[in-house]
Amino acid sequence: VFCNTKKLAEEVALVLRNLGFNSLALHGDMEQKDRNKILVKFANKSLSILVATDVAARGLDIDSLDLVVNYHLSRDPEVHTHRIGRTGRAGNTGLACSLFHESEEYKIEILEKTLSQPIKRTLIDSVEKDFTPAQPDMTTLQIEGGKKQKIRPGDILGALTREDGIEAREVGKINISETSTFVAIKRHSLKKALEVLNNGKIKGKNFRARKI
């Protein structure tokens, strides 16, 4: 979900969380380490909805998104094109939609000229209130060790799938930074994965692991 201001990004993310959605905001006022954690969670599918400003989303490197929503229309047609280009990549299917008021019709007309194609308008009469938000299948663990400690993805997978551990299919994307490692784990295997990591060793050493 794209917003034009940091304040609105925070507010929209909060409203979505209050409705039961797994949602976080991403904007330039956040510390880099916090932005990195959120981007990792979104990329490894342990975060369902990312509400971001354009500047903050520049580091988003995902092959394709199922849905892109413009909560605000971008002031720049090129930025709009870049936003919606994040869905339906490489032959995948995806949906991009924009929320706008009738007073912004002229902006839609500008976008149609820029994109050289018509944009379908749909009037929203009401919003379905009787729903249960889906939760992501994955969750993310952070291990306090990374490249500096010469940790590799195979070391993490081996530690998690040892005899008393979890199955390899329960482990998702593994991201290793200089001093931390982020691992996507199936939500139902979270407790066991934490137990295995915190009571075991990686490369012969103890490393603390926690859910983020």
Predicted features, each with a name:
Residues 1-212:
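Conserved helicase RecA-like core
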